[in-house]
Amino acid sequence: MARKNEIMKSSMGIDYNEYIWSPVAFDYEHLMNDTGYDIDEVFRIQRETKVGNTPLYELKNFTEAVRSFSPPGKGATILVKDEAANASGSFKARRASISAYEAARKGYAGIIAATSGNYGAAVASQAAQRKLKCIIVQEVFDSHLVGQPEIVEKGRSCEAYGAEVLRLSVGPELFYMLLRTLEETGFFNASLY
């Protein structure tokens, strides 16, 4: 779409043209200095919606196995971080929490994300907690128009959180539909694309 940059600016409040050095170079450091949060702010935002601070468990059998092959006094303690304890059951809730916070802070009525998996459920979960409307634009169908079961299931999770799910086939129409939906609704763009 010819209006891509205009739509992106409207849907995020960021003019990416300010950060372009050349057709192949982008000033990410300048962008982060202008728009980023410090770590204390991130933790505060995530605590508000039950994200992060997930439990850490020792896998004792694995630790024992590693140590049985290691020299005496050596061998790691094997730990696993349980990110399923996040509000949406996914580590992607960490990124989604910041997007939903930013959308609410800037006064957007809703949030949109193009995704085929866990990020959609995370965005829908965080949007619900921030009282924002949510649309998930999802690649569901293969080239034979068969819905991929794991992606269909993620769409159901999004709907359970109150999101509207637009189901598409895999291909370039995903980005077109994202831009069109952003333009039509005026919602915040939480996509990772």
Model-derived features: positions:
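PLP-dependent amino-acid enzyme catalytic core
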Residues: M1-Y193
